[in-house]
Swiss-Prot record:
This is Calcium-dependent cell adhesion molecule 1. The gene is cadA. Mediates calcium-dependent cell-cell adhesion during the early stage of development. Sequence repeats lie at residues 1-48, 49-97, 98-146, 147-194. The keyword Coiled coil does not apply.
Amino acid sequence: MSVDANKVKFFFGKNCTGESFEYNKGETVRFNNGDKWNDKFMSCLVGSNVRCNIWEHNEIDTPTPGKFQELAQGSTNNDLTSINGLSKFQVLPGAFQWAVDVKIVNKVNSTAGSYEMTITPYQVDKVACKDGDDFVQLPIPKLTPPDSEIVSHLTVRQTHTPYDYVVNGSVYFKYSPTTGQVTVIKKDETFPKNMTVTQDDNTSFIFNLNSEK
């Protein structure tokens, strides 16, 4: 039994048996109540170049978060039932510990693809997405201490002439290694005044562009 170095293979049965499904590095997958695969994965193989974070729930749990687990690179996980039903997971590059999932929503006009948002965490490669795109995964390395805030440069640029930047600021993210929850921190002096942020689940954030100024 094996899996590609850059993938995770989940199984319906314990001990890596039964029907299986593979997911690639950079994917964040969440199942909702009633979905075919919600709470169905019972074991998995993690490729040698990736790690995998798994959650019992995919929502922001209040007041008590569901169960959470970090699965190591190259690991064989024969019994995932301790998670009480897997509803969400992230397949991360092996050198990273956690990730934020981000998207931009255009509230300025009705034309999809009008703006491109770029987020660049400190000493980490940037990710970019356009309004109308789905969430993109932004992996973060292990910090010291692990629940430190990480500052990220945030820009939004028009994708049409004159290609002006309409946002230039920063946002902070903070991770809980106990629950796997990510929180966003907006500092008044640096967070763009023409944007708001909505948390969509335990790692996912929607950045709303409300105006160009």
